[in-house]
Each structure stands twice: as structure tokens, then as C-alpha cells.
């Protein structure tokens, strides 16, 4: 009986720690976005013309912009080339600090749909761009509000 209790407690700690991992995400601010934009523009060598479009939330379908958005999503901490998007972290960013998010929520489902639909795109930059655009095209105001534009 003691062994069973120890095993159950161990399982509870593992599950609690796994769930806690998502609570480690810190919601980013408009200042963070501005810093990330500067860093990513430099990384991908975006032209002044493209930079002006990005500031207006316009993202043309070209290789530079694809990699720019990949960089932005990586800086936010919810995309990596090996695992793709972390849907839960994106949802936390959109919901804002202190708001509990649930997988059954409509927004969560939309994020997951876009991430899954575009997970098989060619290169990592294309995956990030097309999945990001999928979500932004239907939820731009929510995205903008999440960084207090």
C-alpha cells in the first residue's frame, strides 16, 4: 500500500511539473516586440520598404519575410525549428498575463489548426510564415492587442 501511495505521489509531482512548464512562459510586451523586430530585421537583412510594411502588420509572401516571422516567433519563445509551434505558449501570449487558458477554448483550437495545417510546409521559415499568417489573418486584432499596439 505504501508503494502505491509513493507511486501516486510521484506521478502527481511529474504531472504537476509538466503542467507547470507552461506557466514558465512570460507574456511579452510591445517593448519586447520592438526589440525583436530590430534584431530580426538585422538577422534577415530586410529592406527599409519591408520594415515599413512589417510596422503596419503587413507581411508579403517572400523568403525574407518568411524568415523574419520565423525569427520573431523564435524570439517570443513559441516556435523552434525542431518542434514547430508551442500552441499553449501562443495562447498564453494572446490571453495576457494572469489569464488561464484551456485547450478546449476556440482560440486554442484555431492556433492548433493553423500550426498543424502548415506543419508540413517546405523549410522552417515557410512553416512559421504560413502558420503565423493563417492565424493572424483571422485574429489580427487579438494578436495586436496581445502586445498592446
From Swiss-Prot:
Changing residue 82 to D: In strain: 10A, 100A, 101A, 149A, 158A, 189A, 195A, 223A, 233A, 237A, 28A, 303A, 312A, 319A, 324A, 325A, 32A, 335A, 340A, 348A, 350A, 352A, 356A, 358A, 359A, 360A, 362A, 365A, 367A, 371A, 380A, 383A, 386A, 387A, 390A, 393A, 398A, 40A, 405A, 41A, 443A, 486A, 514A, 517A, 528A, 554A, 59A, 627A, 639A, 672A, 703A, 707A, 712A, 730A, 739A, 761A, 762A, 767A, 770A, 786A, 788A, 793A, 804A, 820A, 833A, 834A, 836A, 849A, 850A, 851A, 852A, 853A and 855A. Belongs to the PBP/GOBP family. Residues 1-16 form the signal peptide. It comes from Drosophila melanogaster (Fruit fly). Disulfide bonds join 40-71, 67-125, 114-134. GO terms for biological process: olfactory behavior; response to pheromone; sensory perception of chemical stimulus; sensory perception of smell. Present in the aqueous fluid surrounding olfactory sensory dendrites and are thought to aid in the capture and transport of hydrophobic odorants into and through this fluid. This is General odorant-binding protein 99b. Keywords: Disulfide bond, Olfaction, Secreted, Sensory transduction, Signal, Transport. The keyword Transport applies. The gene is Obp99b.
